Amino acid sequence: MNIYALSSGRGPSGIAIVRISGSETLKICQNLTKSKDIKSNEVNFCKFYDPNNGNVIDPEALLLWFPGPNSYTGEDLAELQIHGSNAVINALLRVLSCLLYTSDAADEMRR
């Protein structure tokens, strides 16, 4: 099962962090960025898009991709660092809610 959660505080803030964990993480990130060239264990500067309509969610974001088992959860893990406005946070969470199970804080710890 793939999960996601807002790992930082709720906006508004300078930056918000969303984590995704599970076997489909890379594929989800490729859909969000419209890129197959996501480098592992490096900071990827990218744009995040809504895969349903192609609208830009965040034009200047960071993506960190950690393949399992060498990640915090032991599974494939991505950390999405986005602008911390409520509009950007809500847009990304809305897209992810259509694709993934929403985790609570304990889900990542249990993994």
Predicted features by range, described:
Residues 1-103:
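A glycine-rich (often HGG/GG-containing) alpha/beta subdomain
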Residues 101-111:
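Single conserved hydrophobic/aromatic residue that forms the stacking wall/gate
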